Amino acid sequence: MAITTLDFNQFRSTSADERQIFCADLCETLSVYGFAKIRNTTLSNELIDEIFKYTRSFFALPNDIKAKAKHPNAPNPHRGWSAIGQERVWKISGFEQNKERTDSYNEFRESFDQGAADDQLFPNRWVDEDDLPGFQAFMEGFYKSCDELHAHLLRAISTGLKLPDTLLPSKHRHNTSELRLLHYPPIPCSALRSNMRIGEHSDFGTLTLLLQDSVGGLQVEDQRNPRSFIPVEPEDGYEVVINIGDCLQRWTNRRLCSANHRVMLPEGKDVDSEEVLDDRYSVAYFGKPDRDVLVDTLPECVEVGERVEYGDHLTALQYNQIKLTRTYG
């Protein structure tokens, strides 16, 4: 079983029928997997090459230089460089199913988080310009490019769900989304027998856009067969993997569900082997609603007589903080 790949050129077609087919296919794929792959997006191949160049360059910096932009040893502000072991995503595994983990394990990765350049609540943290020339300017521009693609996809999902095409975009007027660079250092296959590169989790926000290199290892839980995982292997490095976040699950009353995912051994690797896995790099844009927007089930997504699953009147910021506090707690 493989995650469906869609062509974004269909959404940009001058044919209304073609655009409608794309929107319907997108929502169908997301309803089955919680994930989809999209090629030919508004993120050009050149732009993707450049973001991976900067990602590798940033993580190659000495730790004392990266620490100039250090993420605090606390949930907020969720900005800057997190060293290996600082964030523990496994602690939110099962959160949406009201399940508490009783086990624990190590996660082998480091990350860098940023928000919008004008975010006054949680300002960004950067290394000095001389440490990595052009990094801040490029990252701020790339963030805007991801924001534009995210807005297109929100319109497509709204259309595919037969909602007003402005409904989901209207909840993202003041960008509070986050852009994350990730580095998974080399590690023996055998070390992942009882550990993970990143633990099983679902994403907090609306929709995640993911770019991954050729190493592999990303897996998504099969929504029709819980506890079975499907590999989301890279194709050519230029497709965008998208996945549903918890807020969209809540708004749609589970018509679209956020799927658990993790990073484990790539396909074809042996957990009993002492072979050392290569560095793995990825880039994730976590689309998130405006902080004061409620993430209750939307009335437009409830059929007559259907039970409303989410009515706890949490704002997007409150929900985000509940999960974030666990990962850095």
UniProtKB/Swiss-Prot annotation:
Biotechnology: applications noted: Due to their effectiveness as antifungal agents, echinocandin derivatives can be used for the treatment of human invasive candidiasis.
Superkingdom of the source species: Eukaryota
Oxidoreductase keyword on record: yes
Record-linked InterPro entries: DIOX_N (IPR026992), IPNS-like_FE2OG_OXY (IPR044861), IPNS-like_sf (IPR027443), Iron_ascorbate_oxido_reductase (IPR050231), Oxoglu/Fe-dep_dioxygenase_dom (IPR005123)
GO biological process, one term: small molecule biosynthetic process
Pathway stated in the Swiss-Prot or TrEMBL entry: Antifungal biosynthesis
Binding site for Fe cation: H201, D203, H261
Residues reported in the UniProt entry to bind 2-oxoglutarate: R280
Enzyme Commission number, as recorded: 1.14.-.-
Keyword Disulfide bond carried by entry: no
Principal EC category: oxidoreductase
Keywords for the protein's UniProt record, in alphabetical order: Dioxygenase, Iron, Metal-binding, Oxidoreductase
Molecular function as annotated in GO: dioxygenase activity; metal ion binding
Role this protein plays: 2-oxoglutarate-dependent dioxygenase; part of the gene cluster that mediates the de novo generation of L-homotyrosine from acetyl-CoA and 4-hydroxyphenyl-pyruvate. L-homotyrosine is a building block of echinocandin B, a fungal lipidated cyclic hexapeptide that acts as an antifungal agent. This is followed by isomerization of 2-(4-hydroxy-benzyl)-malate to 3-(4-hydroxybenzyl)-malate by htyD.
Protein name (database record): 2-oxoglutarate-dependent dioxygenase htyE
Gene source species: Aspergillus rugulosus (Emericella rugulosa)
